[in-house]
């Protein structure tokens, strides 16, 4: 699997594909099934927002790493109208479509980090991360590989 995969979002089938990419990467990185499902659900909600509000966009899924943890990064971009009131859009229960009803607040709750960058008339970028702590054996293997 490449370091970063981009999935164009223009139909429901594209969201399914993006979910699958996220789930596969989560599995490869050692995330639990529960966390893989949380990641896939967050991708689905963000993808539905793209379809509903912008009509199309893209989701980029990649891995990240720090000394003690590995992570998945999901960046969703669209060229839609932007979000006029981010605070309102991030309120629990605020919904404008027919997804799972989680929307942006639900996606934020499912992931460890969540950032929205939006500009009226120019679109929105949502960046989300989910982390998994590395165990000691993983850290030792990586240290040995980098020195050998």
Label every PLM stretch briefly.
Residues 1-6, 47-148:
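Conserved beta-strand-loop-beta-strand hairpin that lines the nucleotide-binding pocket
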Residues 1-41, 141-148:
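Bergerat-fold GHKL ATPase/HATPase_c domain
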